[in-house]
A protein has these predicted regions:
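Catalytic phosphate/nucleotide-handling subdomain of diverse soluble enzymes
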Residues: 412, 416-454, 460
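Active-site diphosphate/adenylate-binding microenvironment
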Residues: 6-10, 14-19, 27, 32-37, ...
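N-terminal alpha/beta PP-like core and its mobile active-site loop of ThDP/TPP-dependent enzymes
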Residues: 1-331, 367, 371-374, 454-457, ...
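Hydrophobic, well-ordered secondary-structure elements that form the walls
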Residues: 296, 368, 380, 419, ...
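Generic hydrophobic/aromatic pocket-lining and core-packing "Φ" positions
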Residues: 10, 86, 142, 416-417, ...
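Active-site nucleophile and cofactor-binding loops and adjacent substrate-binding regions
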Residues: 24-26, 45-56, 71-78, 133-134, ...
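Thiamine diphosphate
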Residues: 114, 450-543
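Phosphate/pyrophosphate-binding active-site segments
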Residues: 136, 293-384, 508-512, 517, ...
């Protein structure tokens, strides 16, 4: 049948099972929005306050559901406003499809009004991108974009469609979309045998879990693997929830703000089994001294991650779910009683701790955990509050911590929380932000209010850019350059002005009451938590130091006393 480009686009989205799109209209994309209007009962559109919010919402939707997130933007500044969100998704391997419309084909390359080369701009931050200049190519391009976004190592794909293409007609034949095969090559069984042999020989194995285990939906296989190996487990920020944070073998996060137990344990292990992690600098500390006593065995879907940041001894390339299932079939039951006992002693000796008297970031996280019974989707911005959330909320399920781990995007959380709630409406969704991050995209409070999306926005408000100030305090002679937010911004009044409910908390009791209110409010709520600007994230690894030199507040005080 003959359809115009806008009709073909909407039909192809329906083929892919798309039920929600986040975006912002404009002149170049008007044909698409006109067609979307006719299908509003099948595809709901969430009008964000800014295109960056739309890209983050698509990202949050994808992380929470495991499906592809979709965002729309018009040409020029509409398209460029998506860039930060696309880059965020790219760094964390999140499948989104960003659809932009450009000026008509005859106007391309002529500096036309709102013309921009968005495919050129996004080439380094997309898995693939397309500009469709012929309507006859549109349907196959959209189908290909969704396949690329989901297969192999996931990632964002951009499709740029000139306006005249959305109006031109072509033959459209609907197709039934087949399930995506994530990894099409067979796993090398010789590599599997080597992996099993290394595990059997190890006396002090340690499992390190990254976001790849979540992207592969491999939590069940991971738990079975750990049961077989019988060894301690740590994770990266992106791996939170892949392995239950309440399990006896779990030791916490690894790296710069990881637990001493994880950092010391990995440093003393003789085999580090890496499951879907990329060895970022935030994990390894000094890479030349990382896990220096251990052989390293890496499981990953992307061969490019092998020997990229850390030299490994053996690797198995493949979908994590399939790799673990195959290893589990071949691996005999292991036992490492003495090694586990030593790690448990570390856990008892080096617990996470914070000042118990006042309203602090860690208390806020623990109270959220208590009231949500560990069953919420937690979204964070970037900074101290992000680390506190990773440390003090015990994540037991995958896709329950949504955070910008690679790009470290301030302003990510509120849009992502909206996307997560639209994808998982049955879940409590909480976005935790610092006051600096909240300012970046707080206009999305109006979006949540417009659609009465019941997300809870917790602002951990210390009136400074906390993480940067912490570094200035420890490593820059307490010279607080541009990190003190001396102003009179009232987040409660701002939230109320945008149509949300809001409350301020200055004590523990006030926060507990405020969060209880937010859980039952039936709409968006902003909680402004006033905490001390001197609160810090502990433990910490100094820049350039090995993770075996992780220190906390007590260590720092003892060092200052001896000096």
């Amino acid at each position: 049948m003959q359809l115009n480009g806008a009709e073909i686009l909407i039909e192809c989205l329906k083929e892919q099972g798309v039920d929600t799109v986040f975006g912002y209209p404009g002149g170049a994309i008007l044909n698409v929005y006109d067609e979307l209007y006719k299908h509003s009962n099948e595809i709901r559109h969430i009008l964000t306050s800014h295109e960056q919010g739309a890209s983050h919402a698509a990202d949050g939707y994808a992380r929470a559901t495991g499906k592809v997130g979709v965002c729309f933007a018009t040409s020029g500044p509409g398209a460029t406003n998506l860039v930060t969100g696309i880059a965020t998704a790219f760094m964390d391997s999140i499948p989104i499809v960003a659809i932009t419309c450009n000026v008509g084909v005859p106007l391309l390359g002529k500096d036309s009004f709102q013309e921009i080369d968005i495919t050129g701009i996004t080439m380094p931050i997309t898995k693939y991108n397309f500009i469709v200049k012929n309507v006859n190519d549109l349907a196959k391009t959209i189908r290909k974009a969704f396949e690329i976004a989901q297969s192999g190592r996931p990632g964002p794909v951009l499709i740029d469609i000139p306006k005249d293409v959305t109006g031109n007609k072509a033959e459209y034949e609907p197709v039934k979309i087949q399930p995506i095969v994530k990894y099409k090559k067979e796993i090398c069984m010789e590599d599997i045998d080597k992996a099993v042999e290394m595990i059997e020989e190890a006396k002090r194995p340690f499992v390190f879990v990254g976001g790849g285990a979540i992207l592969s939906d491999a939590s069940e296989e991971l738990r079975a693997f750990v049961d077989k190996v019988q060894c301690p487990v740590c994770d990266s920020l992106m791996g939170k929830g892949a392995f239950p944070g309440t399990d006896e073998l779990y030791t916490g996060m690894l790296g710069m703000h990881g637990t001493k137990t994880s950092n010391f344990g990995v440093s003393e292990s003789d085999l580090l089994i890496v499951v879907g992690a990329r060895f970022s600098d935030r994990v390894t500390g000094n890479p030349n001294k990382f896990a220096s006593n251990a052989k390293i065995l890496q499981f990953d879907i992307d061969v490019a991650e092998m020997n990229k940041n850390v030299i490994i001894d053996e690797g198995v390339v493949g979908d994590i779910k399939e790799v673990l299932a195959t290893v589990n079939e071949k691996l005999p039951q292991q036992e490492h009683t003495e090694w586990i006992k030593k790690i448990q002693e570390y856990k008892a000796k080096y617990p996470l701790a914070y000042h118990p008297e006042s309203l602090t970031g860690p208390y806020v996280i623990e109270e959220i955990y208590k009231q949500t019974e560990g069953d919420a989707i937690i979204v964070t911005e970037v900074g101290q509050h992000q680390m506190w959330a990773a440390q003090y909320y015990k994540f037991t399920k995958p896709r329950t911590l949504l955070t910008s781990g690679g790009l470290g995007t301030m302003g990510y959380g509120l849009g992502a929380a909206i996307g997560a709630k639209m994808g998982r409406p049955e879940k409590t969704v909480v976005n935790i932000a610092g006051d600096g991050c909240f300012r970046m995209n707080m206009n999305e409070v109006a979006t949540a209010a417009r659609y009465n999306i019941p997300i809870i926005q917790v602002v951990v408000n210390n009136h400074v850019l906390g993480m940067v100030r912490q570094w200035q305090n420890l490593f820059y002679g307490q010279r607080y350059s541009a990190t003190v937010l001396n102003d009179a911004v009232d987040f409660v009044k701002l939230a109320e002005a945008m149509g949300a409910k809001a409350v301020r908390a200055t004590t523990r009791e006030e926060f507990a009451d405020a969060f209880k209110f937010a859980l039952n409010a039936g709409g968006p709520v902003v909680i402004d938590c006033q905490i001390d600007s001197d609160d810090k994230v502990w433990p910490m690894v100094a820049p350039g130091a090995p993770i075996s030199e992780a220190f906390d507040e007590k260590d720092l005080q003892e060092k200052q006393q001896t000096n």
